């Protein structure tokens, strides 16, 4: 059983959803980013998505685009992102880490080398936003063969004809993008999310995590009552962007994480 499977199974027995947190690797610099990464589990993160900086992040909103630029300007590379996971794993062998990003940097790195090094570093899953299931042979197949889950994105515009194809080779969990558009957009209504989750459950038994537009403990709690996971990204990135110092960036992210975790953990009580 993979770390992702173990974590979602554990949370199911506890009767609560997972808090899935996203940060961009290397934002605003390697050392600060690593400290944030290491601090997230104690602050309540159940699963961590780590963004792989890329020069053309087309699916991301302004906040994450700027985070990517900060990371690249600070010298972040795919090799350093894998190194960051390795350093995290020295002290934490249980929290799942999912790398999220685009295929181009992996293709340039070399798929075989990337999969081998990602596995060795302790990466548990991949979300590649611009690689559809028609291209499974390029990365999904070798990744899953090495024990790395391949997580698919579904959206409000993924129709019933397309959905089975998208979900067919998914593993780890399903990431439902609740608002069509770029990251950081407005949040969907609970009615919409309820209907979407019911539709997804007709096609998959995998845990379903919902993201895009979730910023507050109240919003996180509302989604945690419906989904298996709550994904928060832009809100953390904004904390880093507006911090006056690296120390305040770390504190801002971890304080927000603790508040969101409390919302998620208490969502189904009462």
From Swiss-Prot:
One of its GO terms (cellular component) is cytosol. InterPro entries: Aldolase_TIM, RibuloseP-bd_barrel, Trp_synthase_alpha_AS, Trp_synthase_suA. The active site is at residues 49, 60. It comes from the Bacteria. Pathway: Amino-acid biosynthesis; L-tryptophan biosynthesis; L-tryptophan from chorismate: step 5/5. Its EC number is 4.2.1.20. GO terms for molecular function: tryptophan synthase activity. CDD domains: Tryptophan_synthase_alpha. The keyword Ribonucleoprotein does not apply. It catalyses: (1S,2R)-1-C-(indol-3-yl)glycerol 3-phosphate + L-serine = D-glyceraldehyde 3-phosphate + L-tryptophan + H2O. It is an enzyme of class 4 (lyase). Belongs to the TrpA family. The alpha subunit is responsible for the aldol cleavage of indoleglycerol phosphate to indole and glyceraldehyde 3-phosphate. PANTHER family: TRYPTOPHAN SYNTHASE ALPHA CHAIN, CHLOROPLASTIC, TRYPTOPHAN SYNTHASE, ALPHA CHAIN. NCBIfam families: trpA. This is Tryptophan synthase alpha chain. It comes from Pseudomonas savastanoi pv. phaseolicola (strain 1448A / Race 6). The lineage of its organism: Bacteria, Pseudomonadati, Pseudomonadota, Gammaproteobacteria, Pseudomonadales. The gene is trpA.
